[in-house]
Amino acid sequence: MKNVKRMIFSGAVVSVCAFSAIAAAAGMNRNKNDGELPASAKISKDTPVIVLDAGHGGIDGGCSSADGVPEKGINLSILLKLRDMLEISGYDVVVTRDTDTSIHDKGIEGIAQQKSSDMDNRLAIFNDNDNAVCISIHQNQFTQPQYHGAQMFYSATNPESESLARAMKSSFTKLLQPDNQREIKQCGKELFLCYFSKNPTVMVECGFLSNPEEAALLASDEYQAKVAFTIFSGISEFIASS
């Protein structure tokens, strides 16, 4: 298992200039509701480590769009953009994967066994830090194509996870999807990482690959950058208010 960790700008402050520059690079200069960018957070030795997970990977492609674009690549692309934004802003960031791979233990045979090992190793990374905020990036799918929009899932295992989910939902509504009425949703053991993570954790379903219009957006580099910035803003809002 490879635990990928990058640490920069220890003790730095997320300045308004840096925050605005990241927003501009993502093509999102202003909050659509009130004309203001979300609150930035001051980085200190007590600031949580940000742990990012790109769902699926390797032989596990996740769901796919109608034209065959797999979820795993979209998840990873958003994660890499988000990691850069966070690191530029001074956060310490850990990722479960930064390539198209499963992180199961070597020597494990069989798809089911590899998947189980992969999830165990992701959870170990989530729980490796006593002070962390964990985000698992995914895409949604449904049998009917009309459904669209991001949705946040959290577990009651950590009492702060609900607040993180609300901050993330608020960020998506303010910055990217003003008409999104999807409520945050509490999960059970079926969402393994969320349920068993000891840190505040949210699974961000960024959109529906079963919706052709949203799938086309999610496959585009420009929209992925906007999604990454929206998640970045949700994290910053949560930490600033904690």
Which residues does each PLM region occupy?
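Catalytic-site microenvironment of enzymes
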Residues: M1-S242
